[in-house]
């Protein structure tokens, strides 16, 4: 389960995803129905601080104003002084990061509302999902796997496996090897357009030469929702993953383990 956290929940979170409350309800119902066959639950959690490259506190304009949420910051904007790092020591790192993003044709740097700040209510798992997670743990006598991501201040980390760009080239091999061990993998969470999609792509690219693994993966499409404006693009990308890697796209009601 990807980032089933309060800050992504509809009407209450700082980066709320429309449809997320119903997604969680369907996900917990699916987990309950399949309790006897669901071996393990792995959850990723966004875990941030205020001073990170995708938060407003990192940046100021020439007048000292911080950017508004959803501002896009480009390499040229920083190169020519439209935006600069609040801490001048970070400017060179920020320029390098933006250049790497743009040269790789990846996502643009978006300033997100402050979300999933470490230790806050918004960073916690949503309550009904948490209840089901630990009910599963008690019934199956297995500890849930919690994977924290997004703590590096100098980069974005949408996917569960690795950052968008990272000088250290960190890859979460523990997660990948856990995935390799299972007969079937079901992915749900928020948002389908960003962290779910990025996680799926990273996993599939790692196992791209082993269709016996990629074909085990199912996206529970009614247990995830996109950020507004990305609906059509997300559907097209999911269809492309299905075509290329043989994953399955199913409603939770269609999957009985």
List each language-model region with its residue ranges.
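Active-site-adjacent betaalpha module
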Residues: 2-42, 48-257
């Amino acid at each position: 389960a990807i980032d089933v956290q309060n800050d992504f929940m509809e009407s209450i979170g700082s980066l709320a995803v429309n449809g997320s409350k119903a997604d969680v309800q369907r996900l917990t119902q699916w987990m309950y129905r399949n309790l006897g066959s669901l071996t393990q639950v792995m959850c990723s959690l966004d875990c941030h601080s205020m001073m990170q490259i995708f938060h407003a506190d990192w940046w100021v304009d020439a007048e000292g104003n911080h950017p508004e949420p959803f501002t896009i910051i480009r390499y040229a904007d920083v190169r020519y002084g439209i935006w600069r790092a609040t801490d001048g020591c970070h400017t060179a790192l920020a320029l390098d990061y933006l250049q790497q993003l743009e040269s790789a044709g990846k996502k643009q740097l978006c300033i997100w509302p402050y979300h999933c700040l470490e230790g806050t209510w918004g960073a916690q798992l949503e309550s009904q999902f948490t209840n089901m997670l630990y009910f599963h743990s008690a019934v199956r006598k297995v500890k849930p796997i919690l994977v924290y991501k997004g703590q590096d201040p100098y980069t974005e980390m949408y996917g569960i496996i690795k950052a968008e760009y990272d000088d250290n080239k960190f890859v979460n091999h523990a997660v990948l090897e856990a995935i390799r061990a299972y007969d079937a993998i079901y992915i749900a969470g928020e948002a389908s357009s960003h962290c779910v999609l990025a996680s799926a792509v990273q996993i599939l690219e790692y196992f791209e030469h082993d269709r016996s693994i990629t074909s085990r993966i199912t996206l529970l499409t009614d247990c995830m929702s996109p950020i507004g404006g990305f609906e059509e693009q997300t559907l097209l990308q999911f269809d492309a993953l299905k075509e290329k890697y043989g994953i399955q796209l199913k409603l939770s009601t269609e999957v009985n383990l």
